[in-house]
Amino acid sequence: MAQQLPIRFSEVLQLASVGIQPSSFGFANVTLESDKYVCVRDNPNGVNQVVIVDLEDPSNVLRRPISADSVILHPKKKIIALKAQRQLQVFDLEAKAKINSYVMNQDVVYWTWISDSVIGMVTDTSVFHWTVSGSDPVKMFDRHSSLNGTQIISYKSNYNEEWFTLIGISSRDNRIAGNLQLYSKKRKVSQPLESHASAFAVIQPEGVDHEVQVLALASRLPTGSKLSIVEVDRNPNNPAFATKTVDLFFPPEAVNDFPIAIEIGSTYNVAYVVTKYGFIHVYDLETAKCIYMNRVSGESIFVTTAHKSVNGLMAINRKGQVLSVSINPETIIPYILSNLNDPGLAVRMASHANLPGADNLYMQQFQQLMAQGNYSEAAKVAASSPRGILRTSQVIDQFKLIQAAPGQIAPILQYFGTLLDKGPLNEHETIELARPVLAQNRIQLLEKWYGENKLACTEALGDLVKPYNTPFALKIYETANVPNKVVMCLSELGDFGKLATYTSQQNITPDYVSLLQNLVRVNPDQAAEFATQMFNSNPSINLEKIVDIFMSQNLVQQATAFLLDALKDDNPEHSHLQTRLLEINLINAPQVADAILGNQMFTHFDRAVIASLCERAGLVQRALELYDKPADIKRVIVHSNLLNPEWLMNYFSRFSPDEVYDYLREMLRSNLRQNLQIVVQIATRYSDLVGAQRIIEMFEKFKTFEGLYYYLGSIVNITEDPEVVYKYIQAACLMNQFTEVERICRDNNVYNPEKVKNLLKEAKLADQLPLILVCDRYDFVNDLVFYLFRNNMFQFIEIYVQRINPSKTPQVVGALLDIDCDEELVQNLLMSVVGQVPVDELVEEVERRNRLKLLLPYLESLLQSGSQDRAIYDALAKIYIDSNNNPEVFLKENNFYDTLTVGKYCEKRDPYLAFIAYEKGGNDTEIINLCNENSMFKQLARYLLKRSDSNLWSEVLQDSAYRRPLLDQVIATAVPESSDPEAVSIVVKALMEVDLPSQLIELLEKIVLQPSSFSENANLQNLLFLTAIKADKSRVMEYIDKLDKYDVDEIAEIAIENGLYEEAFRIYKIHNKHEQAMKVLVEDIVSLDRAQDYAETVEQPEVWSRLAKAQLDGIRIPDAIESYLKADDPSNYSEVIELASRAGKYEELIKYLLMARSKMHEPDVDSALLIAYAKTNQLTEMETFLIGSNVADVKAVGDECFESKNYEAAKLMYSSISNWSMLATTLVYLGEYQGAVDCARKANSIKVWKQVGTACIDKREFRLAQICGLNLIVHAEELPGLIRLYEERGYFEEVISLMEAGLGLERAHMAFYTELAILYAKYKPERMMEHLKLFWGRLNMAKVIRACDQMHLWNEAVFLYVHDQSYDNAAAVMMEQPEAFDHQSFKDIIVHVANLELYYRALNFYLEQHPMLLTDLLAALTPRIDHPRVIRIFEKSENTPLILNFMVAIQHLNIQAVNHAYNDLLIEMEDYQSLQDSIENYDHFDAIALARRLEKHSLLEFRRIAAYIYRKNKRWTQSIELSKQDRFYKDAIITARDSDQTTIAEDLMKYFVEIGNYECFAAILYTCYHLLRNDLVMEISWRKGLQDYAYPYFINFQCEMFSKVLNLEKDLKDRQAVKSEEESASTIGAGILGNTLMLTQGPMANNNDQFDSFQQASPMPRLGNF
């Protein structure tokens, strides 16, 4: 019955099986945009993840740590769209790149992919479309007001995105209402409708030319449920499509069910309507007829999509099942016919979807229309018949036989026209249509239909078309893939290029050489291309022959092109062809050869031969590349004017240093002027290789300083050899290249400066700039000044300091002063320098020579020019100090000198001037050292107070001899003089940091206790307190009485921290801070009695609260509660409840809690009061409390009472909050089982059902236990534990009764049926098979099979193995357990096993247990077993007679082992006739071995068979001897004839003569006539007188000889006639390729055998041979 269902239903995947949490199975977390991927937002272990499951490969699960509000995946690609609040992002997961992002200004409440590139997004007010490739979202339309307050569940568009539907649902009047907004993009209008689900579809109703676009709507309204199919966007060329509306059925129990989706099956033209509760409705789109309805999911469905691969739908339910539903193409048509009784629908669907099942209807309809003469309708029926059942040759013949009425189109043409309108023709139809079209010479019609893909291209069609149009036939052959006909057509058309391509693609090999020879004469270029393609497709072709073909026509270019492509792999075996290619081109086209060699395409040619040809052709460069001998190279290389310089330089890289040196010398020696430039370039490049010194010597040897200069100039900038640079400078001087000398001296870092300096001095150049540069760079300033001054070149000294390096002016001045130059000259030189002169160095140089005043004019000029160089002011300060020219004013007013330098300069001269300089510069360290050394403590104290630097104070207050006098000045002078609080505070901090409390107290008392500007300073008072607390606690109480500006809280806290509790208490008490005072009493002094007295004294609530907390901490709970009551303070209720509960003070606690309830409404307070009532057993007060208003956590209190086994109180609690689950458990403990079951039914909780059920089982309340159990067995995870509970207590009948009662449950699952089967196996095996037959499809086969194995239920085990398709196990059980064996079943099972070894195990089993059934088993296994192995098995056990029929059945396979065993069995049975048939028909056996065995057989016929075998295997002698032995002379004569050997035939003839059997003599003459020599026959006949027996032979021989002579005579005459004609004809020259002369094959050649026999017959008879 299951096979007759019109749908296919399967579970694609369990989301839980791929590790997704069940809590994630919902509309908000799961999206299903297509049948390719499921996308889930999961949260395992609190980690947000996005899980993508590939539905085509469920093991391919992709997890990404992504946090988002919503995720949708592209329908086809791994492109993911994420929404986090208003942030939208799209990522390509495979490319790992962001595609687009956007921030919305409204919240997106729903979104979905409406196409491959567009996401539809719905906000609270509008609908947007977002093209993710890069643009921003575009608003499409506004939401209709009817959708306000609804949850959007669907947004869809039609195929061209012109119509859209937006659906929202909401709760209204105790039902789920659906609202739909239909929007037209073209008209920009919306229409509101009441609907829950919708889908667009395109159909083509019967009789309508164009497609119709429809919209399917499903709704459930209070008045009824409807499915409507309406037309949208009507085509004006179509008739109007009538709206179809039908009732949508919902079962009575599905009160709250409603449609959630509609999916379209376009192939079948059906709509799948899915409801929330898992019902599927299948409707025909054209008629809106319901085809099928059923429930496919026990859990509610929340998302669906189209399952395109099967034209169905895919859905996901709350259990995480991914379900697939689709039409079953095999059963849908029979179902419609049998169940719906709607032939019209069946025919229409079968035609549209090409389905089986309606064939008879089509045939009946066709024959009926033909009989009525309605040929056009009959043609339509045939054209639309499913699977082409009516498009056959018989139907065509039927139409052809019908005569056309006058003036009407012939029926056969109507038929073909209908077929062409419907689609492409099949092969037979195409042929039948082509014949009349070609006969009318209207081939253009065929070409038109071919272009429209309406024809079925076959070889037969091509053969029909070829006589009319060869190019069109070529297309047909190509489409039909007929290679030989394609090659033929391409050859006829001359399209050899396409021919080569085609043959290469098709892997066929035509006669290429002939094709090439023809093509060379017609199109040489195309021939070259063809030859290349021919070689590429067949590399073994003879290349020499192809080259010869090209060269025979002197096609050098084409031959070259072919060889270049053919030899591109540069194989060694093609060396001769490489040489030939280069020879051809060097002779005919040297430039081509040059290009070939330049591209280095070949490496295996004869280098010597090609090099010589290159030299002759003027290709000097190529010749050099190929020559290896030095003599050849020297001969050619001197012609550098013919060579590319760059190439020549690279060419030298292949030589050793000595060879390079030799070739360069040869080039200079041969023609120095011509080759000098290239030699210099080569020498430059290979300088490191050959050695610069050798090259320098070479140029010097040839006395070419020009070459030396240019060579060294090219390497001087990169060399590290000082000698090379020196030689270059020397050569440049000789070549008068002074600019280059200057550049090298300025920029080069390699040369020896001393050596170059001496060279330049000796050269006495007119321009001393190079010398100046060398001396400046290497600090030879003194030498330079001395040289220039002594040689009266003072102008170059001026040039040096003015233009070259003004920074060296100090050294120049120093050198001039050292040689006693006139000071005026030096001052003038200084005044002439306009560059930046380092004044500090200049001052140092002059000061070292005690000539500082010399600089005064220069320095003052710099000062007047506005220079602010510090060195100038330093120098002026020193001059003013030494000259005592008002230095104090200068030091105080000037801000540009270096205070450190000047102060250091003044320290020994005048400390006060040094202090001024240091103070101006803030040089703290120097001032400290200066004042300490000179006892200037008063100045230092004032300076420190002014500086207000804590670090500086830390430094001076370090323990030293200077600290005490400094502090005295600070306390006595500096601080009293100061009015800056910040400065004083820094001093105080400094004293604190260095821990000088006595001095600090002394300082503070002076400025705080005594009248001063700091007396009222709170910070200083605080500091005084702090210092006293740390250093002298006895003064603290005195300060409390004297001071009043200090920070009370801070000082009190510090006093407490330092143990001065009484002082702290006094501070708080004086300042009326009673709460803090109480805190000191209870926490620090720890005197609760004093605290009690103090609280009674002050009578303040906060004081009582503080006291109560202390009493509570001291576990004086009644006192604490009393204090809290006096304070009227419930704030600390949590701690009071905890401690009072722990101490069991519930009576006191009740008073406190009642006070607290009057002040606040806290759940903890009310809960604690309930607990207190429970603990004091005040159930009446508790019940009153529960009836009244309260905020207690009743469940938690009830749980606590339950845990403490106070079940009566717990019962009250749970009853008040209707907590049926816990109430049921409580009633169990109270023994009220019926009430417990009633509560469990209300709770409907698995845990409760388990608890109540367990209690009922323990109390043997099996009726109640069954009620509980029925609610548990529907949960697979609870079932094993429940069964184990019954089994452990021995209640087997009861558990089986429970399970049987659950068989009718709607939610019965696989585990349920499986466990019931196991129970039957254990306790009621007699009912096991019945259960298996009914429910085998809903069992866990593996578990039930294990149970059957354990309980030895072998028949049941076999049944399960078969239905589980575990045929191997089923067969094994049947062989191992006799009671499970059934021959017929075993035959059906064994043919399906996967383990082939079971075949042979079964054969052995049958051989041992059921030998008479072996033949039947072998018949079933024949196609599957290894026949030689079977034969070996039975041969080994000597049971081959049992399988005789098997061997006969398979002998046609001609297997050696089978033939051998069969023949042995026939010999054993002495059945020679069957043996003869076997040997004649099947030759795969060891014939010689069988013959040797048979020739010794006792029966004559077997020996005759042995002779036959010998004859068949060409053992002629052995066969004849065996035949002679048994006197089978006829067999012997036949053997001699078959041997075709004269010796064997003559020996047998002699044997017959010897034994006197003349009849056999005559017989052999006739039979072996062609083997016997005539002379021998005549001799034997004459000697033995056997002429009468031999005369027939002689007569025939003479006749044959006469015929041969006549033929020879005729042949001779014909030859003479031909020879005469040839002599008279003109001579034809030899062919291009030098073809040799071939002999004409005349009649003589056809009679060689007769001619040979004639020659053998000519000599005289040879007597004496007999």
Curated annotation (Swiss-Prot):
Region annotation WD40-like repeat 5: where it falls in the sequence: 195-255
Keywords annotated in UniProt: Coated pit, Cytoplasmic vesicle, Membrane, Phosphoprotein, Repeat
An MF annotation (GO) of this entry: clathrin light chain binding
Organism from which the protein derives: Schizosaccharomyces pombe (strain 972 / ATCC 24843) (Fission yeast)
Free-text function comment from the UniProt entry: Clathrin is the major protein of the polyhedral coat of coated pits and vesicles.
GO BP: any one term: endosome to plasma membrane protein transport
Annotated stretches, region: WD40-like repeat 6: 256-299
Keyword Iron-sulfur tagged: no
Mapped CHCR repeat ranges: 534-680, 683-825, 830-969, 975-1120, 1124-1265, 1270-1415, 1418-1561
Matches recorded under SUPFAM superfamilies: ARM repeat, Clathrin heavy-chain terminal domain
Domain of life assignment: Eukaryota
Family to which this protein belongs: Belongs to the clathrin heavy chain family.
A Gene Ontology term for the protein's cellular component: clathrin complex
Quaternary structure and interacting proteins, as annotated: Clathrin triskelions, composed of 3 heavy chains and 3 light chains, are the basic subunits of the clathrin coat.
Topology in membrane: Peripheral membrane protein
Region (WD40-like repeat 1): 24-67
Gene that this sequence comes from: chc1
Name this polypeptide is given: Probable clathrin heavy chain
Pfam name, any one: Clathrin_H_link
Region annotation (WD40-like repeat 7) ranges: 300-328
Location of the region described as WD40-like repeat 4 in the Swiss-Prot/TrEMBL record: 149-194
Domain-related comment: The C-terminal third of the heavy chains forms the hub of the triskelion. This region contains the trimerization domain and the light-chain binding domain involved in the assembly of the clathrin lattice. The N-terminal seven-bladed beta-propeller is formed by WD40-like repeats, and projects inward from the polyhedral outer clathrin coat. It constitutes a major protein-protein interaction node.
